[in-house]
Amino acid sequence: MKMVKSIAAGLTAAAAIGAAAAGVTSIMAGGPVVYQMQPVVFGAPLPLDPASAPDVPTAAQLTSLLNSLADPNVSFANKGSLVEGGIGGTEARIADHKLKKAAEHGDLPLSFSVTNIQPAAAGSATADVSVSGPKLSSPVTQNVTFVNQGGWMLSRASAMELLQAAGN
C-alpha cells in the first residue's frame, strides 16, 4: 500500500509538472511578445536646436587687421590678404606713399577701437571703427564693412573710403 501511495504521488506530481509545462508552451506558442508604445502627449512641439550664432568677427580680430594695415614698416604690396580683392600695384604705391607721409608728419601710430559689430549680408559684418592718433584732437569714427573670405578682411569699398579719407 505504501508503494501504491508513492506511485500515485509520483503520477500526480508528473501530471502537475506536465500540465504546467503544457500551459507554458501554449503561451509561448503564440509567438514572441511585442510591446507597442502608446503616445501620451499629442500636439506638443519638439524642442528645436538653438539658433546658430551669427558669423561675426571679434573686436580683437578686426583691431589686429586694422593695425596690420596701418603698419608703415610693411609695404601695402604685402597686405593684399587684408583687403577684399587684394591690393593692386598702383594702389599699393599710393597707400605706401600716404602712410610714409603720415609717419613723417607725426600722425602715427594710430589706435583703433572697434565697437558695434553686426552681421550684414552673407559672409560680411559691419563695425564702428574709431581711430585716434597723435594729431587727432578727438577720435574719428566711421562705419566699416568687413568680409569673410576664408578669413576676415576689409571690404574693398571700405578700404577705398579709408584711403580717400586719409588723403584729405
Swiss-Prot record:
Cystines in this chain: none
Compartments, as annotated in UniProt: Secreted
Propeptide, chain numbering: 23-48
Keywords: Secreted, Signal
Signal listed as a keyword: yes
Top-level taxon in the UniProt lineage: Bacteria
UniProt signal peptide: 1-22
The UniProt record lists the keyword Acetylation: no
GO annotations of cellular component type: extracellular region; peptidoglycan-based cell wall
Family affiliation: Belongs to the MTB12 family.
Functional description taken from the UniProt entry: May play a role in the development of protective immune responses.
Protein name: Low molecular weight antigen MTB12
Organism: Mycobacterium tuberculosis (strain ATCC 25618 / H37Rv)
